[in-house]
Amino acid sequence: MNSSSSTMNEEPDALSVVNQLRDLAADPLNRRAIVQDQGCLPGLILFMDHPNPPVVHSALLALRYLAECRANREKMKGELGMMLSLQNVIQKSTTPGETKLLASEIYDILQSSNMADGDSFNEMNSRRRKAQFFLGTTNKRAKTVVLHIDGLDDTSRRNLCEEALLKIKGVISFTFQMAVQRCVVRIRSDLKAEALASAIASTKVMKAQQVVKSESGEEMLVPFQDTPVEVEQNTELPDYLPEDESPTKEQDKAVSRVGSHPEGGASWLSTAANFLSRSFYW
């Protein structure tokens, strides 16, 4: 068995590898290739059992991205250890609440990929209720907030926004729609949207307004109060979970890895697969 310390100077460690896979999976153009690769999907499954919680969370984020592609779901569901590993993450008492919710969502997506009868639907609902029980009362439901962010106009600003949102305890996921300067954020029901605005305002270069729909269905921008809101911060800075496919056209590629190209992604997949085989197969 190779220790991570012996290879750290030569190869990236587990967290950097899984984070790179997560970033590659964020680009819709890479998702099929990652799932078809012989080493990446099994590696992500093994990462779900990693002792380092950020590695587990990042692996789940990558899987959630991959599951957004409907063509991937059957293969993912049938991959050896996938569903069992997701169950283990959900049921493990030491798993953080947001991580359990993320694993539960992936499980439900894959479990429902070929469901056609009522029994299967009931099984999925039962599964969701069980996951909610594990999450506790403060995590029963999540809500989605759509933000229009003035100043969100390049990758450096997006990175600033990511860092600000990742610090907020209760943020489950977010995805960017750069073409329209928007961010779709999924948060726990007990977190106020004003906390998101305060975090974004703390960057000093961006300001958020909430996007809401009127009774007639028209979108409106609602400004937040300028009064800062006290924000409970994460101590371990978990990663985020992507939302469902954006209603805007996919070519926006708002969540693409910076500088990613199909050929570059394929090259990096080879590097990642090589690392996974060296690290996990013995």
From Swiss-Prot:
The modification Phosphothreonine is found at T137. One of its GO terms (cellular component) is cytosol. ARM repeats lie at residues 39-81. Residues 246-255 have a biased composition (Basic and acidic residues). Transmembrane segments: none annotated. Its main location: cytoplasm. It is found in: Cytoplasm; Mitochondrion; Mitochondrion outer membrane. The keyword Kinase does not apply. Keywords: Acetylation, Cytoplasm, Membrane, Mitochondrion, Mitochondrion outer membrane, Phosphoprotein. Disulfide bonds: none annotated. One of its GO terms (molecular function) is metal ion binding. The modification Phosphoserine is found at S189, S246, S260, S267. GO terms for biological process: intracellular distribution of mitochondria. Coiled coil: none annotated. Interacts with mitochondrial contact site and cristae organizing system (MICOS) complex components IMMT/MIC60 and MICOS10/MIC10. Interacts with mitochondrial outer membrane sorting assembly machinery (SAM) complex components SAMM50 and MTX1. In association with mitochondrial contact site and cristae organizing system (MICOS) complex components and mitochondrial outer membrane sorting assembly machinery (SAM) complex components may regulate mitochondrial dynamics playing a role in determining mitochondrial length, distribution and motility. This is Armadillo repeat-containing protein 1. It comes from Bos taurus. The gene is ARMC1.
